[in-house]
């Protein structure tokens, strides 16, 4: 039975028994920033089991895509370790319990899957007699029902719902056993294969560790598709099922190897297939490779897959093809893969090419470090060196560890951690600031508990009467503030929007019987409490007074234009670049907007033009902009976009742009897109690995930007004395002329270099038959220095050459040793390492060629003399 048929039969079996078939949730847990991945079938339903939310359906069935990485090093080594896997599960939220879950499980595995009852064993929790009796009632012999302890057969996650488990095991026969007297279900050997786990959620554990029965117990089951497929397809490992074998065979063909010929090669192919599935599904769900969080996990998996291919001799990019093979195989069950096809291809291709560049640079360095360690008879790579590879070249520690292990070396991980901690010390000031923020938050939380929440009425009106509830200055409450004083104001009702979700806070005015003031900012230090920064301009502002608050309407309208434009930008970027685009941050201010989003490379001019054009088309369409409140689950069902990492309550606000965009958003917006006016993108930049930033202006600010650019064009045209219409052609001619002059200059420099080389040849000396040249030269950069070295090597033949130059306050050194002298024990890397140390630097390289740098130009002459002395010492019989 193939995996598609197993998946189909499971869903249909429980659908026929009143279960609602729910599509798989994203690998990114919705509305739960505490979880990195959806790692189990129950994760999407966690709020229902914990009582945080009320389920729409009391019986559901799913095939949930899951991702786990704690045992990443075991993938490919064992029969069943995976990063990405599928979990079949049926769930009851206060509906049926053991009396149905157990008979249905038995019916499905014996009838629908056709597994022989004599091969099935059952485990129950030690004192779960109820489950034991249900299994016995189905005809399972008592000797094939084993009672296991809390470690394996009791599910709990700290405080909250919990309960005993019952597992279905498939007995593969004595040939797969460990021959231990205690061998049975629960044993770690390969005989007993757990294929289904039924969790009976019937207790609540409190903070004291006490358990009480739940009024409405529930069911949470999980059947690993890969495991049950291995049983039904009669194969020894999950990797030999149809879920993996096609990918493995495809990869083997691309790499030019055969699966089954070599255990090490087979393990590498398994890793590539497993990791290829994980990265394809994760990228399709919106995760981009980066240096932190989920992005780091995906980057690590992708790089491990590439490394395994390199070990099999693959030098060219290949992983894009593996990802497409995953899509071809799995899109029938997960249509989001087809939707994200182009995004997955682009991301995988870009990341692999980028990593191969990193590998080229890093492998050269780590190869040198390993050679040095061996030369010095060390069995460990220094932690500081491993950290430099990580910090400077983006070389992950685990990759350094793997490469070193292949060469029989360990990595000083304690030293690595020490170097990492030393770098983290630089962040102490930010941690002090964090403590200050925490103390400030505690103050305002206590204030909120005392005076109550602020009622926000700013969606409907820009003016409101309010009562002054508190005045704060320098972290302390004060009874009043006089003219010229600045104070933080808390009221019971306000039309002022507090800074949130990237939108800046409102400005405005306050008016009272004896007071007038100006609001310069509005923020919410804790949820539900609006704080207004006020400068009192006349009279006295007192606690308990009644005032009127007036929002700066002109400023608010500009903010609304930019906020709605931000939603349009988000939607348009997804349409133009791909579904992998997700918001990563924003700033919505009156004069401009800024939008950070997930994308792996700079936008081309054509892409920027298309994004801008599409947004302005929507603006001109005069589409209606509406907002409404609904439950979080209902909003997601409607297709509303939620920001990853954000925590939402049960009731959320949805902003909908007719037929174009729907997002969860608490900000203020225009009523129709035509109010936005022209939208102009002003800048595009990088803000980190896998993150891009767009900046834009709207309305009159967009017009002012265009006018400014037009004025600049006219000024440039006047300066070069051509009409604006001819400016591009004229600049192109100037650039061509500049390139011609640059080429002529380089030719002159080359001629000068040849003359200088002739002069340098006379500086060479001979000692014991070895020609030595250690001298300073004029060179603009390291490339020119190496060029001079190459010319001298050709002219001198058998020789040791060390050249140095001082440019921009730094020392550059290069060295070469001819092959015949390498055979005599001279080593360019060793020579230059000692010389660079004199100039306050370091470096190294191969025996024949090396380079280094230094911080002290005044030590250049001394460093070159040191190099000459090292050569003389070696020639005279010392060490080089």
Swiss-Prot record:
Principal place of residence: cytoplasm
GO cellular component: cytosol
Keywords: Aminoacyl-tRNA synthetase, ATP-binding, Cytoplasm, Ligase, Metal-binding, Nucleotide-binding, Protein biosynthesis, RNA-binding, tRNA-binding, Zinc
Co-factor remark: Binds 1 zinc ion per subunit.
Cofactor entry: Zn(2+)
Highest taxon listed in the record's lineage: Bacteria
Binding site residues for Zn(2+): 563, 567, 665, 669
An annotated Gene Ontology molecular function: ATP binding
Matches recorded under NCBIfam families: alaS (TIGR00344)
Recorded family membership: Belongs to the class-II aminoacyl-tRNA synthetase family.
Domain comment (free text): Consists of three domains; the N-terminal catalytic domain, the editing domain and the C-terminal C-Ala domain. The editing domain removes incorrectly charged amino acids, while the C-Ala domain, along with tRNA(Ala), serves as a bridge to cooperatively bring together the editing and aminoacylation centers thus stimulating deacylation of misacylated tRNAs.
Protein name in the entry: Alanine--tRNA ligase
Organism: Desulforudis audaxviator (strain MP104C)
